[in-house]
Amino acid sequence: MGDSILGYHAHLGAGVILSNVKLDHSEIAVSTPDGDIPTGLRKFGAIVGDRTEIGCNAVINPGSVIGRDCMIYPGVNFRGVLPHGSMVKLLQDLQVLSRRNIGLA
């Protein structure tokens, strides 16, 4: 959670990552619907608003801005700007298959 700003009563569940460096080490920009806003920084985590809850093992990518009173569910990988009072859930399809050739080693 380096180089990040956490609001009053913001909560990060176990294993949450607020990433602060891009993989290619280039300048971090905040991505908005109106375009990117350059920060001039190579290390910049996230801004997390007051009373926001981020669930276990979520990953918040560099330059993300999370509004106040938001909820990000466990396992979400988020990048961008999340408006105040928003909620993000991960939708995934699980496929359960039967195992064949189950034997003792």
Language-model features, listed with the residues they occupy:
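Glycine-rich hexapeptide-repeat left-handed beta-helix
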Residues: 1-105
